[in-house]
Amino acid sequence: MTDAPAHTRERVTISEVARVAGVSKATVSRYIGGDRQLLAEATAKRLEEVIERLGYRPNQMARGLKRGQTRLIGMLVADILNPYSVAVMHGVETACRQHGYSLVVCNTNRDDEQERHHLVALQSYNVEGLIVNTLGHHPGELLNLQRDIPMVLVDRQLPELNVDLVGLDNADAVEQALDHLQAQGYRDILAVSEPLDGTSSRLERVQAFGASISRRPGMRQQVLEIGAGLQGQLASFLAHSGHGPQAIFTFNGVATLAVTRALLEAGRNLVADVGLIALDDLDWYPLVGKGITALAQPTERIGVAAFESLLGRLRGDSGAARRIDFKANLIIRGSTQPQ
């Protein structure tokens, strides 16, 4: 007669282990709780053999709840399909794993009701800390959660929350882009963003763009948000080319994809008709023409820094909220090499 498949067996309990080993449940708890050195060597050896024979696996969640520690970190993201979010998440998860934590990711899909639902769920999971990269349309719920657990923001500032923020030095990234475009001879620059929607990082880029252009005599600027009329708006920009060589500066990967698709559908040549520089560096950029010039964000480092900041708070750091900004890295490709 064969043993029942693992998925149909009843879970072995701590009481069964204690009964078979001939010890108390408290003794078993000491053994699995890391206090083996408090037990007699013979008792510890017997427990090791019984646990192995019965296939006992401690319920880590229950043990964590009893100690007030679940070793779970929550992460709330606005769009799990966004390459930036995926890359940052990878950095967070790597750092979590290195420190013995597990990551619970909740994707709001840019839906306010989903965000509210996930905030409730994360509380029920008893996460020890929370990393937030979302639109933050429920600041009240986030504020209530912050009173109970440490929280760190990624990329987007929420003024209602006095917590650490980890992201990009947006002003420096914009300055690098415009320095490069100006040096390449471009004079008429169109900035393209996803809808601003109160998102602090997008607003910072738009503000830095306008301020930097105003300090550069002979350069002209426009800003537009991607939407249904993008192809027509790009055509209008390109039709008024009397101010000098034209370039487009996209503020993230989503905007870059929308602009590249619109230009290709309109039969435009990236280098001959218009230059293109992108904030974010995605895998497909080198594959378009002679490659798209990009400002790469150190997304992995941003994710790691977000977790490390949260870990510091979990360990008792009660200092003032900090902003940790990383510099972008300019990668020059063919899309900003006028012929």
From Swiss-Prot:
PROSITE patterns to which the protein is assigned, alphabetical: HTH_LACI_1, HTH_LACI_2
Activity control mechanisms: 2-ketogluconate acts as a molecular effector and causes dissociation of PtxS from its target promoter.
Gene3D superfamilies (alphabetical): 3.40.50.2300, lambda repressor-like DNA-binding domains
Domain of life, source organism: Bacteria
GO cellular component annotations of the record: protein-DNA complex
Keywords: DNA-binding, Repressor, Transcription, Transcription regulation
CDD domains linked to this entry: HTH_LacI (cd01392), PBP1_RegR_EndR_KdgR-like (cd06283)
Record keyword Nucleotidyltransferase present: no
Induction: Negatively autoregulates its own synthesis by binding to a specific operator site within the ptxS upstream region.
Known DNA-binding region: 14-33
Positions of the HTH lacI-type domain: 12-67
UniProt signal peptide: none
InterPro entries: HTH_LacI (IPR000843), Lambda_DNA-bd_dom_sf (IPR010982), Peripla_BP/Lac1_sug-bd_dom (IPR001761), Peripla_BP_I (IPR028082)
GO MF entries: DNA-binding transcription repressor activity; identical protein binding; transcription cis-regulatory region binding
Functional description taken from the UniProt entry: Negatively regulates glucose metabolism by binding directly to the promoter region of the kgu and gad operons. It also negatively regulates its own synthesis.
UniProt domain comment: Contains an N-terminal helix-turn-helix DNA-binding domain and a C-terminal domain that binds the effector.
Subunit (UniProt): Homodimer in solution.
Name listed for the protein in its UniProt record: HTH-type transcriptional regulator PtxS
Species per Swiss-Prot/TrEMBL record: Pseudomonas putida (strain ATCC 47054 / DSM 6125 / CFBP 8728 / NCIMB 11950 / KT2440)
Originating gene: ptxS
